Amino acid sequence: MSFLVDLGATSYIACYATQQAVVARRCSGDLDRDCFLLTEHPPVYTLGKRGGEQHLHISKEMLAQKGIDVVSIERGGEITYHGPGQLVLYPILHLRKRKMRVTEYVGLLEETMIRLAADFGVRVVRNTRNAGVWTEDGRSKIGSIGIAIRHGVSFHGFAFNLNTDLEPFSWINPCGLTGVTATSLAREAGTDFDPAEVKKRLLSIVADLFGEFTVVDSLHSVK
């Protein structure tokens, strides 16, 4: 059975290193189960394989002043923002063993966020040209997806804006798209949410779409 670890608030670099270690174990067969990492990051911009630094509209001096790092990684896509108030899920799944196509997998990530928003009274939709989930008018993005695949094993995942401070999104073209704004579940619903309550619902949806899993306290307990 798969397992899930709630890492709590973790730096992006530390969590990235954790992903790399788990992916290596899953690829080698040392780890024979799929894994979900649930976390939240301090403010950080990440750049995907297509780069995206040209979509950053804030000086390096201002970034340093605000304590926001910029990290280049191998996921798909361009620039995005992570920060407090997001739900970030990194599924490390052996797609090959699951006989799951990448397009099917991305669709399930989108469906996870669509159902999560709906459970709290907010309707969001897919965009056929851009991965992630959006408001019905297609102008605002509430959830971003960026993944990578190594030897049939997925990593990275999605970031869903819950009670997120949206100002840092205004300093970039999110995912390299002009004319797009970011929104959050709190903004769309007009109220803040208890993260613990939303997490509980998220775990239920993940189990429904990807199969049952056990929740473990730490990766150290997983053999």
Swiss-Prot record:
CDD domains: LipB (cd16444). GO terms for molecular function: lipoyl(octanoyl) transferase activity. InterPro entries: aa-tRNA-synth_II/BPL/LPL, BPL_LPL_catalytic, Octanoyltransferase, Octanoyltransferase_CS. The record marks K141 as: Lowers pKa of active site Cys. Pathway: Protein modification; protein lipoylation via endogenous pathway; protein N(6)-(lipoyl)lysine from octanoyl-[acyl-carrier-protein]: step 1/2. The active site is at C175 (acyl-thioester intermediate). Coiled coil: none annotated. One of its GO terms (biological process) is protein modification process. Its main location: cytoplasm. One of its GO terms (cellular component) is cytoplasm. The keyword Disulfide bond does not apply. Residues 30-214 form the BPL/LPL catalytic domain. It is an enzyme of class 2 (transferase). Substrate binds at R75, G76, G77, E78, I79, T80, Y81, H82, S144, I145, G146, G157, F158, A159. Pfam families: LplA-B_cat. It catalyses: octanoyl-[ACP] + L-lysyl-[protein] = N(6)-octanoyl-L-lysyl-[protein] + holo-[ACP] + H(+). The keyword Acyltransferase applies. Catalyzes the transfer of endogenously produced octanoic acid from octanoyl-acyl-carrier-protein onto the lipoyl domains of lipoate-dependent enzymes. Lipoyl-ACP can also act as a substrate although octanoyl-ACP is likely to be the physiological substrate. In the reaction, the free carboxyl group of octanoic acid is attached via an amide linkage to the epsilon-amino group of a specific lysine residue of lipoyl domains of lipoate-dependent enzymes. Belongs to the LipB family. This is Octanoyltransferase. It comes from Desulfotalea psychrophila (strain LSv54 / DSM 12343). The gene is lipB.
